[in-house]
């Protein structure tokens, strides 16, 4: 079975700290981003807003060295296990999942 990309040629990527197992972020990758990740050992993604490839930490220095890549049972999602340098989130938080949903109010 092959990886199952969506109609836009993307696959969701969950990124997790290899040591702590903390979930750091959710992003998307296309085939080229996955190939670059495998070739370089550093996480590459597809930016849906900018519509271009990006190496995580390219400007901030907060790179992700990929230790292992796993795929799920349906071959439609990836898990990058990484060594995170600095913070993963553009807000300055270590993880993008730093807020808790309580009640019915969501502030984005």
Swiss-Prot record:
State the UniProt keywords alphabetically: Amino-acid biosynthesis, Cytoplasm, Histidine biosynthesis, Hydrolase, Magnesium, Metal-binding, Zinc
Give the cofactor note text. Binds 1 Mg(2+) ion per subunit. Binds 1 zinc ion per subunit.
Q: Does the keyword Glycoprotein apply?
A: no
Which cysteines pair up through disulfides? They are: none
Location within or outside the cell: Cytoplasm
- The UniProt annotation places Mg(2+) binding at 72, 74, 76
Q: Which reaction does it catalyse?
A: 1-(5-phospho-beta-D-ribosyl)-5'-AMP + H2O = 1-(5-phospho-beta-D-ribosyl)-5-[(5-phospho-beta-D-ribosylamino)methylideneamino]imidazole-4-carboxamide
Entry binding sites for Zn(2+): 73, 89, 96
Q: Name one GO molecular function term.
A: phosphoribosyl-AMP cyclohydrolase activity
Give GO terms for biological process.
L-histidine biosynthetic process
What superkingdom heads the lineage?
Answer: Archaea
Keyword Zinc-finger listed? The answer is: no
Q: Where is the signal peptide?
A: none
Cofactors demanded by this protein: Mg(2+); Zn(2+)
- Coarsely, its chief localization is cytoplasm
Q: Which GO terms describe its cellular component?
A: cytoplasm
Pfam families recorded for this chain?
PRA-CH
Please state the Enzyme Commission number of this protein: 3.5.4.19
Q: In which pathway does it act?
A: Amino-acid biosynthesis; L-histidine biosynthesis; L-histidine from 5-phospho-alpha-D-ribose 1-diphosphate: step 3/9
Q: What does this protein do?
A: Catalyzes the hydrolysis of the adenine ring of phosphoribosyl-AMP.
Q: What protein family is recorded?
A: Belongs to the PRA-CH family.
| Subunit annotation | Homodimer.
Protein name (Swiss-Prot/TrEMBL): Phosphoribosyl-AMP cyclohydrolase
Lineage start? Archaea, Methanobacteriati, Methanobacteriota, Archaeoglobi, Archaeoglobales
Task: Name the encoding gene, please.
Answer: hisI
